[in-house]
Regions:
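Conserved active-site carboxylates
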Residues: 180
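Long, positively charged amphipathic alpha-helical accessory segments at protein N-termini or as interdomain linkers
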Residues: 2-31, 45-46, 146-149, 155-173, ...
Length: 323
C-alpha cells in the first residue's frame, strides 16, 4: 500500500455515502490531484469498489476482504471502550500479540489480523484462521473485578457475539455453553477467555474470538465440513466484514457494560433461551473425565447443572461439550 493510501481511504470512508472530490482529498492531504488519482487507481486494483465521476468526485461503495488500519481507526476514535487497535495482515496469534501489547499500558484495545498461523481455541485446540475468510481478533479489557468474575464474563460476552452474528444471519444463532456459537448444527464461532492477574484481582481480560465469515463449505477441511459453517452461508446478501466488525464491537461494548453492572441472574433467562444444549444427550469432558448426560439447568451463578446417565448430578463451571 502506498504512502497515502490509508489516508485517502480514510477520507473516502468518512464521506460515505457522499462523493468527495479529488481536489478536496488533495487539499486535505497536501498532495497533488495527480497523486490522488494514482492512489485511487491503486485502491481499485486492490479490490476497493470506488465510483469515480467527473465533476462529482469519488464514492467508496465497497471494501475488499482486507483489514485496513485507517478504517479500523475510525471505530476506535468513536468508541467509548477501546483506546486503540492493531491490525495485521498475518500473525502467529492475536492472543499472543495482545499479551505483548498490554504490557506497560492500562488501555482497552483489540488486535485484528487477516490470518493467524498458530490460531488456537480452548484446551489448545487448533483453530483454522485462513486469510480473507474470517474475523480473527483478541480483545483486551480492564475490569476492576475479582478472579471469580471470569466465568461470568464468558456468559455475557457469548450473548454479545451471538447478537452480532444474528443481525446478519437469516437462521437462528445459538450459544453452546460455555464458549461456542452455532447456526443450526454448524459451529460458526469459538472464543477463548484468559486473564492477567495480580494480588488484587484481574489486571486484564484477553478474549480471543474466531468467527467464520465468508467461507463456503468447500473451504472447510473435509474432517470438519459437516459441523462447521460461516455467517455468509446464512446471509442472502454479500457480507461486509467492516459492517460486521462494527456491529460486533457495539455488542461487545453493550454486554461488557452489563457485565460490570448486572448480576448473571438478570440475564439468566435470556441466556437459557439462547442456548442449544437443552433436551439432548451430550458428551461432557471435564478435567480429562468424560461422561454422557443432559443439561438440566443453568443456576443463578452461571454453573451448568447436568444429570449423567447414572442419574448423578454435576455442577459445572467449565467443560467441553460434544453433541
Amino acid at each position: 500500500m502506498s504512502k497515502y493510501s490509508q489516508d485517502v481511504l480514510q477520507l473516502l470512508y468518512k464521506n460515505k455515502p457522499n462523493y468527495i472530490s479529488g481536489q478536496s482529498i488533495a487539499e486535505s492531504l497536501n498532495i497533488s490531484r495527480t497523486a490522488v488519482k494514482k492512489v485511487i487507481d491503486q485502491l481499485k486494483l486492490e479490490g476497493c469498489k470506488i465510483d469515480s465521476v467527473n465533476h462529482k468526485g469519488h464514492l467508496l461503495q465497497q471494501l475488499p476482504d482486507i483489514w485496513y488500519q485507517g478504517i479500523i481507526d475510525q471505530y476506535t476514535k468513536s468508541s467509548a471502550l477501546f483506546d486503540f487497535s492493531e491490525v495485521y495482515d498475518s500473525i502467529d496469534s492475536t492472543q499472543l500479540a495482545a499479551k505483548k501489547s498490554l504490557v506497560g499500558n492500562q488501555s482497552s484495545f483489540f488486535i485484528l489480523s487477516d490470518e493467524q498461523t498458530k490460531g488456537r481455541g480452548r484446551f489448545n485446540k487448533h483453530w483454522s484462521s485462513s486469510k480473507g475468510q474470517g474475523l480473527w481478533m483478541s480483545v483486551v479489557l480492564r475490569p476492576n473485578v475479582a478472579f471469580s468474575m471470569i466465568s461470568k464474563f464468558n456468559l455475557f460476552i457469548a450473548l454479545g457475539i451471538r447478537d452480532a452474528i444474528q443481525h446478519f444471519s437469516q437462521d437462528e444463532v445459538k450459544v453452546k455453553w460455555p464458549n461456542d456459537i452455532y447456526i443450526d448444527n454448524g459451529k460458526v464461532c469459538g472464543f477463548l477467555t484468559e486473564m492477567v492477574a495480580n494480588n488484587d484481582g484481574i489486571e486484564a481480560i484477553i478474549c480471543g474470538i474466531g468467527i467464520n465469515l465468508t467461507q463456503q463449505l468447500e473451504n472447510f477441511d473435509e474432517s470438519i465440513r459437516h459441523r462447521a459453517t460461516s455467517v455468509q452461508l446464512h446471509d442472502k446478501n454479500k457480507l461486509d466484514r467492516y459492517q460486521f466488525l462494527e456491529r460486533l464491537l457495539q455488542e461487545i461494548e453493550k454486554r461488557y457494560n452489563q457485565f460490570l453492572t448486572l448480576s448473571f441472574s438478570e440475564i439468566r433467562e435470556e441466556y437459557i433461551a439462547a442456548s442449544n444444549i437443552w433436551n439432548r444427550t451430550l458428551l461432557f469432558t471435564e478435567n480429562d473425565k468424560q461422561f454422557k448426560g443432559q443439561a438440566i439447568d443453568l443456576d443463578y451463578d452461571g454453573y451448568l447443572i447436568v444429570r449423567d446417565e447414572a442419574g448423578e448430578s454435576h455442577r459445572l463451571i467449565s467443560a467441553d461439550i460434544d453433541f
